[in-house]
C-alpha cells in the first residue's frame, strides 16, 4: 500500500507505539490521518501537524469499549467528511491483568467492534470499495507471558480474529494483517500488572530482557503497511520485521 495521498484512521494513534507510528506515517505523506484516542493530547496533534503541514490531521475522542452503534456513528461522521478511507489501524491496548473485564474489552472486543463497524462502509457485498485493516496484536499471541494470562489471551484472541478475517477477504473485499510487537520500551510496559499479583516484578523482569524502542517498532510498522500482505502475521521484535509462518495443527475442512 502506498501511504502517500491515502486516508488513514488510526485508533489509539497517540500512545507509545502509536504516536511514533503516527509520526512515521505522517512523514510518508498521507492525505488525511484521522486519530481516534480515548485521551486528547493537543501537543501531540500539533506536533504531527507541524511535522508535515501538507497532511490533514484530525482528532476525535474515542473509547473502543463504547457500544457498536456509537462506533458506527463516529465512522459515519468520518466517512461523510473524507468520502473514502484506505486503511484502519486498530491499536488500542492495555497491559493490566488486575483489570480483567477492561483488558478483554479493550484488547479484543474493541478491535472486533471497530472492525465490524467499518464493514458498513467497506464490505463489497453492500457495494463498498473494500479496504485494509492492520490490527496491533502482540507476540504474546504466539506464546503467552504466563504471569499475565488475561493480557496474553486477549491478544491471542485478537490474532485469531485477524487471521480469520484475512480468509474472508474474497467475500468482504477487506484485507487484514496483524502487527505483533515484542517487548517495547513504553510507559505501558512499566505499568504492567500481573494476574492476582502472581509476579509483582513482572514489568521489571520483562525489561531485563532485550527490548526495542518505539521508534524501531514504528519504522517496521510502516514497512508492514507498505508491504500490505493480506493474512500476514508480522513479528516486530528487537528492531526486526519478520513474517511468521503459522503452524496448522487442525483444519475445519470448510
Curated annotation (Swiss-Prot):
InterPro entries: ADH_Drosophila-type (IPR002425), NAD(P)-bd_dom_sf (IPR036291), Sc_DH/Rdtase_CS (IPR020904), SDR_fam (IPR002347). NAD(+) binds at residues 10-33. CDD domains: ADH_SDR_c_like. It comes from the Eukaryota. GO terms for molecular function: alcohol dehydrogenase (NAD+) activity. The active site is at 151 (proton acceptor). Belongs to the short-chain dehydrogenases/reductases (SDR) family. This is Alcohol dehydrogenase. It comes from Drosophila silvestris (Fruit fly). The lineage of its organism: Eukaryota, Metazoa, Ecdysozoa, Arthropoda, Hexapoda.
